[in-house]
Curated annotation (Swiss-Prot):
NCBIfam families: pheS. It is an enzyme of class 6 (ligase). Transmembrane segments: none annotated. InterPro entries: aa-tRNA-synth_II, aa-tRNA-synth_II/BPL/LPL, Phe-tRNA-synth_IIc_asu, Phe-tRNA_ligase_II_N, Phe_tRNA_ligase_alpha1_bac, Phenylalanyl-tRNA_Synthase, tRNA-bd_arm. This is Phenylalanine--tRNA ligase alpha subunit. It comes from Beijerinckia indica subsp. indica (strain ATCC 9039 / DSM 1715 / NCIMB 8712). GO terms for biological process: phenylalanyl-tRNA aminoacylation. The lineage of its organism: Bacteria, Pseudomonadati, Pseudomonadota, Alphaproteobacteria, Hyphomicrobiales.
Length: 360
């Protein structure tokens, strides 16, 4: 056995027995470092004849390559062993009780709670939930909803527009959840009965407005849907949501591009002592907008307005949450203040239902 074979066996043995990356690095330096054994052999090549240098150079380089290969393999094994040891040390036994934390229980955000309340109320009336993308086309957000080209909502100061695409079309962050109604009418055949909750976006920010907020809209399409049905649905919703035995509502004429006639709805309330109470008093508070779906919207969605008609409504989820639970500032909803959430949040297992109470 030649000296090179002996050196290779000894070096490979040292590599194999290296217990960690530190020991492996010492082996590498001892063999391939500036003063290493293999480096020393390479330094002797200059004293050899050309023929000897050719033979010995090839042999020493082959030795060096084998050592480098062994070092790389061992390094990979050691890294895997280190990872396995760390994972074993960090394993969590899910059968054991959770260790105490400063916040022993999380809280459900009021917006999530109110969305669940809305779903529970309208599910009892036979409504399904429809959802759509936050980023919408101008066609779905405006055109199919009968917005005229010069409507203020199409202005940059009111709507978040994206840069035009290659075809020159601009997408928007949806300004309402009405595009979900459009998508529903385009993909489903009547009768339709859905609510559309979700995030919406507008260029506005103050104590009662934020650039992102939450909205729920409702849509009913059928051959005989009329304002009487709309009035009953909204009255039943308000009684269930605000948990009062009776409510008085008034419908005021208004204008929305996508409904005709259009109305805004006020609910009777009392403001005594700085507290708003529904179902009593002599004051009125606006809570939502509604109306019969405009014939142009039906046509844009492939429905014959001579056969089908329907109604729709929309309200701010953040706003009705503030009214029901006495929250004075909308901006606090998005500040992630654990103290605020502990005060206004809900227990995780409190699932709203009309039978057990929405906010019990």
């Amino acid at each position: 056995m030649s000296d090179l074979d002996t050196l290779l066996m000894e070096t490979l043995a040292q590599v194999a027995f290296a217990a960690d990356e530190g020991e492996l690095e010492n082996v590498r330096v001892g063999a391939l470092g500036k003063k290493g054994t293999i480096s020393a052999l390479l330094a002797t090549l200059g004293k050899m004849s050309p023929d000897e240098r050719k033979v010995q150079g090839a042999a020493i380089n082959a030795l060096k390559d084998k050592v480098n290969e062994a070092l790389a393999e061992r390094r990979l094994i050691l890294k895997e062993q280190k990872l396995e040891a760390r994972l074993a040390a960090e394993i969590i036994d899910v059968t054991l009780p959770v260790l105490p934390r400063p916040e022993e229980l999380g809280r459900i955000h009021p917006i999530t709670q109110v969305m669940d309340e809305l779903a529970a109320i309208f599910a009892e009336m036979g409504f399904a939930i429809a959802e759509g993308p936050d980023i919408e086309t101008d066609d779905y957000n405006f055109t199919k909803l009968n917005f005229p080209p010069d409507h203020p909502a199409r202005d940059m100061h009111d709507t978040f527009f994206f840069e035009p695409d290659a075809q020159g079309q601009r997408k928007v962050l949806r300004t309402h959840t009405s595009p979900v109604q459009v998508r529903t009418m385009l993909t489903q055949k009547p009768p339709i009965r859905v609510i559309c909750p979700g995030r919406t976006y507008r260029c506005d920010s103050d104590q009662t407005h934020t650039p992102m907020f939450h909205q729920v809209e409702g849509l009913v399409i059928d051959k005989s849907a009329h304002l009487g049905h709309l009035k009953w649905i909204l009255e039943e919703f308000c009684k269930a949501f605000f948990e009062v035995p009776d409510v008085k509502m008034r419908f005021r004429p208004s204008y929305f591009p996508f409904t005709e006639p259009s109305m805004e709805v006020d609910i009777q309330c009392s403001r005594k002592g700085g507290e708003i109470r529904f179902g009593e008093g002599e004051d009125w508070l606006e809570i939502l907008g509604c109306g019969m779906v405009h014939p142009n919207v039906l046509r844009n969605c492939g429905l014959d307005p001579d056969v089908y008609q329907g109604f729709a409504w929309g309200m701010g989820i953040d706003r009705i949450a503030m009214l029901k639970y006495g929250m004075p500032d909308l901006r606090a909803f998005f500040e992630a203040d654990i103290r605020w959430l502990n005060h206004y949040g809900f227990r995780p297992l409190d699932m709203p239902s009309l039978l057990s109470g929405l906010s019990s």
